[in-house]
Design a protein with these regions (language model features):
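Stable alpha-helical structural segments in soluble proteins, enriched in small hydrophobic residues
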Residues: 53, 125-137, 435-445
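Non-catalytic, well-ordered alpha-helical scaffold segments
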Residues: 37-40, 44-47, 51, 121-128, ...
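Gly/serine-rich nucleotide phosphate-binding loop at the start of the catalytic core
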Residues: 2-124, 522
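Short flexible coil/turn linkers enriched for glycine and charged/polar residues
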Residues: 21, 212-215
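Generic detection of short hydrophobic beta-strand segments and adjacent strand-loop junctions
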Residues: 23-29, 180-186, 260-265
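Acidic carboxylate diad motif detector
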Residues: 78-212, 372
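A generic secondary-structure signal for well-formed alpha-helical elements
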Residues: 50-61, 134-141, 248, 289, ...
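Positively charged, helix-rich recognition surfaces that bind polyanionic ligands
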Residues: 15, 217-523
């Protein structure tokens, strides 16, 4: 198993991190029963150290927020220069820094059995991990961090550098008298692994995964430089715009002001069968839980309030293991599909325009779609791959552009989410909503940090764009004839016709382009 990730640390504000670009090579490890016991003991020691440091960090954070200095700083206006100075003094006074909590973690390690299992650098990185969790909570970037239980244990450990602690030496991992050899890809037909192993190792990370109810251990080598791009993944130097939805993506690309390609796709289209299996197992688990604990439920089927004692049968635990495996498969499938789709997008263009969306809002309003399709994860993968290929993902504000409500003739009509087609009553243009928004996004320009739509350029390119948008919708209709497609595509049940059925060509006049154009729709 070979996984390559890319991380551009140029965008990180942490001054302690290296500012050079890095990428990750993940390799499975050959682990004996004895090695597995040692690794599990070290991960358990790290879990207990993490909980100890996290508890101390939350305690210091609580005392700091209760102090009079902190309350006074909060009462100051945001533009007051003394505000940040007082906050900084409070942090130093209550020892709520990464260095102070690393020192506390080192004392905990040296005062108990943890020192027999963890080296200094690994303990310091574990303490830093706990501090960052508390710091995110301090800045309201996440909720209150939870302690790691045995059932949700710590599954990764890393070192600070390749000089000590977890080290990659020659062709194996060395860690406190523990030597672990990886399983290398002997074929390596794209040369990705060979390129990675020739790069400088910054530090190493040990990962524990549960696959098919068995523990597997992997090493992640954080390497300096850029990963090798596979020869089959071609990169285009054109420009494109994408319109992202909770479960769909629309793309329109152009080359030298000539519209080149367009498509409308669904994220992870084959995830439906996995979701069906997950639902079946969840229903079976619920039935088992109700039969084993009849006294814990009210007459209407709801769970009783208060402290309850639950009994779980062996059958329930087996179903729980199957459910966990299905979720792992779904996550791996989703990540693979997003990587493939990102490569397809980059084969169309490496300069990609996109609306700046709130993916947290997607989570609140379309929770199931986001859980299964993860549009925010796709954008992060696309951004990483685009930067690696020398391109960029440019996000523009939706407040001034309003692409889903705007026509190229200048008419602005607010549409409901259920209205999936753009039909302009003034110029007569009809197009699928997502595709048309992606088309207009190609002509968004930045004027003094204000994004606006260049209507004249959009009108000039419409003659070449309309046939491509029609072709993209024709492909969607062909797919809809064989399987169900998302409702957001705007393809109704009557449009899911067999390919032999005739199509109706509707002639209309396009007012802004002053010529006759045709629109093909299924009868």
């Amino acid at each position: 198993m070979l996984i390559l990730l890319y991380n551009n640390n140029m965008n990180k504000s942490n001054k302690h991190k290296s500012k050079s670009p890095s990428f990750i090579l993940e390799l499975p490890l050959i682990v004996t029963v004895s090695d597995e016991h040692i690794l599990n003991a070290r991960l358990e020691s790290a879990r207990q150290l993490y909980n100890a440091v996290l508890g101390e960090a939350l305690k210091r954070l609580s005392l700091m927020k209760e102090s009079k200095q902190w309350q006074y700083a909060r009462s100051l206006l945001r533009n007051n220069p003394d505000k940040s100075k007082i906050f900084k003094l409070c942090v130093e006074q209550f020892n709520f820094t990464d260095y102070d909590l690393q020192t506390y973690g080192t004392k905990c390690k040296n005062s108990c059995f943890i020192g027999e299992h963890l080296d200094a650098h690994t303990a310091q990185k574990t303490s830093t991990r706990a501090f960052k969790s508390a710091q995110r909570y301090q800045f309201r970037q996440s909720g209150k961090p939870r302690f790691k239980s045995k059932w949700k244990s710590l599954n990764s450990l890393e070192s600070k550098s390749n000089a000590s602690g977890i080290r990659w030496k020659d062709d194996h991992i060395e860690w406190n008298n523990l030597n672990l050899k990886p399983i290398l890809d002997k074929k390596d037909k794209h040369g990705v692994q060979a390129h990675a192993l020739q790069s400088k190792v910054k530090y190493c990370r040990i990962i524990r995964k549960n696959i098919k109810n068995k523990q597997r251990f992997y090493v992640q080598l954080i390497l300096s430089g850029f990963p090798k791009i596979k020869t089959k993944n071609t990169i285009s130097n054109d420009k494109a715009c994408i319109d992202i939805g909770p479960s769909t993506i629309a793309l329109v690309s152009k080359h030298d002001n000539i519209i080149k390609d367009a498509f409308l796709k669904e994220f992870c289209p084959n995830a439906k069968q996995l979701k069906k299996n997950i639902r079946r197992i969840q229903r079976a688990m619920d039935r088992s839980k109700r039969l084993s604990n009849p006294d814990n439920f009210n007459s209407n089927g709801t769970v009783k309030k208060g402290l309850l004692k639950w009994v779980f049968t062996n059958g329930y635990l087996r179903l729980k293991a199957k459910l966990s495996e299905l979720y792992r498969i779904l996550a791996a499938y989703r990540k693979t599909e997003h990587g493939k789709l990102a490569n397809i997008v980059l084969s169309k263009a490496n300069i990609i325009m996109a609306e700046k969306l709130s993916y947290k809002s997607f989570q609140k309003n379309y929770s199931k779609s986001v859980r299964d399709k993860a549009p925010g994860m796709f954008m992060s993968i696309l951004r990483r791959k685009a930067e690696n290929a020398g391109g960029n993902v440019i996000e523009f504000s939706t407040k001034t552009t309003k692409l889903s409500q705007t026509c190229q003739c200048g008419n602005i009509i607010k549409k409901s989410l259920s209205q999936r087609w753009h039909i302009c009553p003034i110029c007569g243009i009809k197009a699928q909503r997502d595709l048309y928004s992606a088309y207009l996004g190609l002509f968004v320009v930045n004027n003094n940090d204000i994004w606006n739509l260049d209507i004249d350029s959009a009108c000039k390119s419409w003659n070449t764009a309309e046939p491509l948008l029609e072709k993209a919708m024709s492909n969607v209709i062909q797919i809809a004839s064989s399987r169900k497609v998302p409702v957001s595509f705007g393809v109704k049940s009557k449009d899911r016709a067999i390919p032999s059925q005739s199509s109706v060509v509707m002639q209309r006049d396009s007012g802004c382009c002053n010529n006759k154009v045709s629109f093909i729709a299924r009868a």
